[in-house]
Amino acid sequence: SEYEKKHFSVEVTEIISPKLERDRNLIFLSDLHNNEFGRDNGELVAAIHRLHPDAVLSGGDMMVCKGKRDIKVPLKLFRQLAASYPVYCGNGNHENRMVWERSLYGDLYEEYRDAMTAMGVHYLEDSFAFLGRDLRIAGLDLALCFYRKALYQKVPLMPPGYLERKLGKGPSDCKEEPFTILLAHSPLYFDSYARWGADLTLAGHFHGGTIRIPGLGGVMTPQYQFFLPWCAGDFERDGKRMIVSRGLGTHSINIRLNNRPQLVLIRLRRA
């Protein structure tokens, strides 16, 4: 509904790990797609301030790159957030599309990334940054093939060693190692992320499944997959966790039904 699209909910997940030296509260944003909650996203920023996070993490798709060249909305939002908090950003397919479709976007990707880094944002392109000694945040750029529309061809499996080639050897379970958060836009490959060693994967991309049906979950993803289990929510594999956000915006299929936009608060607690 139109009402839902403009009224986000704040949802809390707690994660406990012996790898952490201290407790932290993190905000996770995803899939804004140029949506605005109040002027210049004032309502979203105010809600984040009320939660007093230690850092803000973004999982990508903060703009709409479908022939449009508008990056003003996310830049205004991140300028406000970076003035108050450490900010860590990974890419989604819409950020990456500016690279994949150079003929259309020119240097817009570099313009966006450079504006973000000038604000002090940690911009993670197949790279890592730390938040203290005990918390490491990685951003994974997935190749275009992993975002194929399932109507036309099968979505590919992730080849063995893909994450190692992109990000190097994964973390171990040793509690002396930092707790590793992976910003990986698509939740489809959670098995690979967990196998690589990410303690917590943060994903979005599926917009909660567009329409959510009680007992069944999300109906359809932007890749035209139906009733996938991980359209949104909290998942576990062999002690590794994944949080999939319903996102904050929409684009081509501008519908949200029983599927409010979501601001995620993650409470990391030391075991």
Question: PLM ranges: what are they?
Answer:
Residues S186-V264:
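Conserved beta-sheet core of the metallophosphoesterase superfamily
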Residues D23-H33, D134-F146, I181-A184, R241-R246:
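Active-site-proximal beta-strand elements of phosphoester/diester hydrolases
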Residues N34, M62-C65, N93-R97, A143-C145, ...:
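Solvent-exposed loop/turn segments at secondary-structure junctions
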Residues S1-L20:
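N-terminal membrane-anchoring alpha-helices
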Residues F28-S30, A55-D61, P86-N93, L124-D126, ...:
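Active-site neighborhood of phospho(di)ester-bond hydrolases with catalytic His/Asp-centered motifs
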Residues E14-I27, V121, F128-G139, E236-R241, ...:
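Beta-strand-turn-beta hairpins that frame and shape the catalytic cleft
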Residues K19-H122:
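Membrane-embedded segments
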Residues V99-G120, F128, G132-T180, F190, ...:
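Binuclear metal-dependent hydrolase catalytic cores centered on His/Asp/Glu-rich metal-binding motifs
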